[in-house]
Amino acid sequence: MQPASAKWYDRRDYVFIEFCVEDSKDVNVNFEKSKLTFSCLGGSDNFKHLNEIDLFHCIDPNDSKHKRTDRSILCCLRKGESGQSWPRLTKERAKLNWLSVDFNNWKDWEDDSDEDMSNFDRFSEMMNNMGGDEDVDLPEVDGADDDSQDSDDEKMPDLE
């Protein structure tokens, strides 16, 4: 029995944990106020996985849930205190080799503000317009379409 590999990420009201177990069977997820216990049989060899996580902060076990797919089990933990950032998933600072941050879904929601997003939207619009207007006539550049030989078109000497 060994822990399943997992990825996690933080949101304003929820913490998400994805246990990466393909073809899982007999999935059991137990949500407690400050602990999560996950177990299942996984893969074609029905290997037994068990993860016990002492959580960084409390959650609402009644409003937390999980969903199984063919590739993983996604747990959605409702934070006990909404809007509180979790700098890590576990209570202890110890590095767990089976647990990593899901940077594909990570979002720094603490710094979000409408003003910041409006600046980003303006920047994005400016970048889109940098390609120029397609209807603009550009001046002719001498030799741009010329098929004449340049000095760098000469034959290279053979290597010795």
Curated annotation (Swiss-Prot):
GO biological process: chaperone cofactor-dependent protein refolding; chaperone-mediated protein complex assembly; positive regulation of telomere maintenance via telomerase; prostaglandin biosynthetic process; prostanoid biosynthetic process; protein folding; protein stabilization; signal transduction
Cell compartments where the protein resides: Cytoplasm
Root EC class: isomerase
GO cellular component, as recorded: chromosome, telomeric region; cytosol; nucleoplasm; nucleus; protein folding chaperone complex; protein-containing complex; telomerase holoenzyme complex
Cross-link (Glycyl lysine isopeptide (Lys-Gly) (interchain with G-Cter in SUMO2)): 35, 65
N6-acetyllysine found at: 33
Superkingdom of source: Eukaryota
An example Gene Ontology molecular-function term: DNA polymerase binding
Predominant place of localization: cytoplasm
Catalysed reactions, as listed in the record: prostaglandin H2 = prostaglandin E2
EC number of the protein: 5.3.99.3
Sequence positions bearing Phosphoserine: 44, 85, 100, 113, 118, 148, 151
Pathway participation: Lipid metabolism; prostaglandin biosynthesis
Annotated site, Cleavage, chain positions: 142-143
Locus of motif PXLE motif: 157-160
Biological role: Cytosolic prostaglandin synthase that catalyzes the oxidoreduction of prostaglandin endoperoxide H2 (PGH2) to prostaglandin E2 (PGE2). Molecular chaperone that localizes to genomic response elements in a hormone-dependent manner and disrupts receptor-mediated transcriptional activation, by promoting disassembly of transcriptional regulatory complexes. Facilitates HIF alpha proteins hydroxylation via interaction with EGLN1/PHD2, leading to recruit EGLN1/PHD2 to the HSP90 pathway.
Domain-related comment: The PXLE motif mediates interaction with EGLN1/PHD2.
UniProt subunit comment: Probably forms a complex composed of chaperones HSP90 and HSP70, co-chaperones STIP1/HOP, CDC37, PPP5C, PTGES3/p23, TSC1 and client protein TSC2. Binds to the progesterone receptor. Interacts with TERT; the interaction, together with HSP90AA1, is required for correct assembly and stabilization of the telomerase holoenzyme complex. Interacts (via PXLE motif) with EGLN1/PHD2, recruiting EGLN1/PHD2 to the HSP90 pathway to facilitate HIF alpha proteins hydroxylation. Interacts with HSP90AA1, FLCN, FNIP1 and FNIP2.
Protein name: Prostaglandin E synthase 3
Lineage: Eukaryota, Metazoa, Chordata, Craniata, Vertebrata
Gene: PTGES3
